[in-house]
Amino acid sequence: MKTIFINRITLAAIAVVFSAFLFTSCQKENSTSGTDALTADQAADFADESTQADASFSDVEDLGMIAAEEDGAASTGRGYHPLFEELRLRTGACANITVTPNDSTYPKTITIDFGDGCLGPDGKFRKGAIIIHLTAPIRQSGAVATITFRNFYLNRAHIEGTKILTNLSSGGNVKFTVQVVNGAVTFPNGRGWQYDELKAVTQIDGGTTPFVRDDVYKIEGRSRTALNGGATLVLNTETPLIKKVVCPWFNNGVLKINANSHVMFVDYGAPNNGDCDNKALLTWNNGANSRLITLP
């Protein structure tokens, strides 16, 4: 059984921040750029890259949560034995995983170092390091995981910023808020995006077992991407995104993307009806136009 506790002060504080973020995002949804009007094709190109930026930070969150969960489950009657078996299924053997201090006490830091880069079993190329600071076991209400980077690349896109996961579980319901501060993604083509998000993550399956692989989460909220010197796009969950830990990508759910007067949708369940794959369908012009997106 995965154990959870309650921290009402933290819950209230995060709720206020989350509400403020949503209010600000709503204000900006209909005026997402101060630059010249975008063409439909430009908006689609930007939506494609914004979706990839969003998915890049989701991948980091995925690895951070898996590492934190396996660390929290590592303490047994015979000592502290983190095996990171599930994490290794994603990163492969090339990542150097260290825990400091290497025992069952907190706070602690987990570092996943990919060195000069390698291709993981999930088909993703990673380089540099992901650093996870934990204040407490991640399943404890009020626990905070702060994720930072050291020269980190995902599929040759440079990822920067700070990602903060806060456990707000109560009454048997496992829930986290996820926030990105000063995020940035620079693609190999040189185009750079600023990125911020605030989302609610709720566990909807797997919570009654000690295993990580059967966990399934529902994600709701907003994110924003701002092209350096250009347009700003707002990404809102039209229908909740569904994420199975066993799959490296979202399985279902729809994002609504606003870019100036253009409204687009990203369907993670299409085109393969929710199968585990790195594809999503971007549509615009009321569905008259579409593009298949390859996710990192």
PLM features per residue range, with description:
Residues 2-13:
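Bacterial N-terminal signal peptides that target proteins for export
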Residues 21-25:
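C-terminal motif of bacterial Sec signal peptides marking the signal peptidase cleavage site
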Residues 28-296:
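Low-complexity, intrinsically disordered segments exposed to solvent
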Residues 16-20:
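Alpha-helical transmembrane segments
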Residues 14, 27:
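C-terminal, active-site-flanking charged/polar segments
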